[in-house]
Amino acid sequence: MLEKINKPNDIHKIALADFPQLADEIRQFLIESVSQTGGHLASNLGVVELTLALHNVLDLPQDKIVWDVGHQAYTHKILTGRKEGFKNLRKEGGMSGFPKRCESDCDTFDAGHSSNSISAGLGYVRARDLLGQNYRVVSVIGDGALTGGMAYEALNNAAELKTNFIIVLNDNNMSISKNVGGMSSYLSALRTAEAYTGMKLNVTKTLKKVPKVGTAVVDTMRRTKSSIKQLIIPGMLFENMGLTYLGPVDGHNMRQMMKLFNEAKRVEGPVIVHVLTHKGRGYEPASLHPDQFHGTGPFDIKTGRQLSVKKGPTYTDVFSQAMVKLGKENPKLVGITAAMKEGTGLRAFEKAFPDRLFDVGIAEEHAVSFAAGLALGGVIPVVAIYSSFLQRAVDQMLHDVCMQKLHVIFAIDRAGLVGADGETHQGNFDLSYLTMMPNMTVMAPKNGRELEKMLEFAVHAAGPCAIRYPKGTAYQGLEEFDSPIRFGKSEVLYRGEKTALLSVGRMTEVCEQVCKELKNKGENPTFVNARFVKPLDTELLDELAKDHKLFVTVEENVRNGGFGEHVAAYMEACHPEVRVLPIAIWNRFVEHGEIASLRAKIGLSAPDILDAIEEYEEQE
C-alpha cells in the first residue's frame, strides 16, 4: 500500500479496507527509518491512524493541519510525498524532523515548541473568514501540551469568536486521566453516536430560531443536563468554555475516527475531538518505554538499544549528580522542571527528595513565577529548563525574579548548538536575553567539573543566577585548571602577550585547539576562560589592556547582545586602543545538522576562528 502514496491526497485512492495494512506498513517504515537516522519515534507511532483519518476527511493543501510541537508529523510527511526525505531525516541539508513550510505547502506552520497550535490555527480561521474563503482548519494538540497556559488562552478566544474550527486532542494518557466506569462508557458512546450528535445540532439550530425564548431554552437545557455529565465526562470542561466536545474515540480505530471527524465538520463553531492514542504502538520497546523513544538516536531494532556508545557523563548527568549531592547538604534546595524530568536530569533528585521536586507541566512562565514565590518563602529553587524553552519566560525572569533580586537559580540546559532538532531548539539566544536583565548573574562552565562548582557557588550566592551548559558529553579537559569560583572573576588559563582569546563555556574546548595552533605558528596568546558573562571581569580586561593589542571573544550565541558585544562596548569606552574581534553566530536561526558540521558552516570551528584572526590581523 505504501508504494501508492507519492503525493498529497493519494490516500483518497486507498480503499478503507486497506487502511489497516497501510498503517502497519507506515509503522514498519518509521521504525526502520528512525532506527537508522534517529528522531522522534514513540509519538509518531501513536498517531498513524489519527493522521490517516485526518488526511482522508480533509483536502490538503487547501485544508490546513496545524501540528502542536510538530515532532509527531512523520506520517503527515509520508502522506504528503516525502518518503524519500527520511533517508536524511534531521541531517544537514536533509528533511527536518518538524513541519517546515519551505518543505511542502501541506505544512502550514513551522513548529517545534508546545501549546501554540490552537492560537496559530485560530489565526488561520479568522483570516479565512475575513477573506471570505472556504477551507477547514484543524489543530492537533497533545494532552501534555494542554498543561501550557497558552493553549487555554487560545481555547477561551476560540469559544468567544464562535467560528468553525476543529481541535483534535491527541490524548496518549500523558496528562489527562482516562475515563472509567460503565456510565462514562455509555455516555461517551451516546455522545459520539451519529444520531445523537445530529439530533443535538438540529434541535439547537431549531430552538435558536424561536423568537425571544429560543436561546434561553437552549441555555436552560445545557445547564440542566450538565449536573451529571460534569461529574463523568471530561469534555464538560470544554463545553462550559463554549466549545462543542466530541469523544473520546479510539485513536487506532479508523472507522470511528473518520465518523467523528466528519461529524466535527458539521458542527457550527469550535469543536474539540478527543482521541485516545497509545505512544509507541506497534513497537514493543517504544510502547513499554515511550520516554526513551521520544527523541532517540540510531538504535538496534531487535533490542531497542542505542547504537551510539556513551563516551562519558553528559553535562546533564553532571548537573543531575550535583543536584542530589547539594540536596543532601541543604534541605532548602528544591528543583523545578517544566515536564522535562528526564531531559533535564532531575529524575534522580526526585527519587532522592520526592517532596522537593516540582514538575509544573509545560508551563515555563508559571515555573519561573512559582520559583519566585518559593524563594520568597525561604527555599532555594533551581529551575532546570532547556535554553530555547526558557525564552517563553523572559518577562517572568525580568519582572518577578530580577526586579525583586530573588535567589532563584536557572540551570539552562541545551545552551548553544543542539544539532538535529534544528532552529526551534538551538540555544543561541540565552546570553543575549539574560545579560540585559538587571541583577542577573550569568555563568558558563568550561567542563563538567566547573559546572559542579558553579552550581555549588550559585546555591550559596545571593540574587538570581543563571548557568548555561550544552547538550552532550561533558568536556573533561583542562581539569588541571581548577581555581575557586569567585563572583565576576574569569580564569586565566595561559598568560601570553599581544592577543587575548576570551572564550565562553563549551567554546573553551574549541579555543584550546586554536591556542595550540597559534603557538605552533610562533605566537603566544593569552587564553581566558570567561566563566562569568555577567558581570564582566573588568579588572582583568583593564589588566590585559596594558600589554595586548587584540581581544578575540568566542561564544556559541548570537552576536547581538552577546558576550563579545559587551566586551567590545567596555573596551571602546575604557580602552579604545585595544581592538576587539567578536566571534559568534550572526543574527540568524541555525538549521538542523551535526554540531561539528554546523560550527564549520557558521564560522565557529577551530580552523574558522584561526582564519578569522589571521584575516583581521592582515586588515589591520
Model regions: which residues?
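Active-site nucleophile and cofactor-binding loops and adjacent substrate-binding regions
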Residues: 38-47, 66-71, 99-118, 141-145, ...
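Cofactor-binding active-site loop characterized by glycine-rich and histidine/acidic residues
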Residues: 40-161, 315, 332-333, 337-338, ...
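Structural signature of the thiamine diphosphate
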Residues: 217-285, 407-412, 431-480, 606-620
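Glycine-/acidic-rich phosphate or pyrophosphate-binding loops and their flanking alpha/beta elements
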Residues: 259-262, 294-295, 304, 314-329, ...
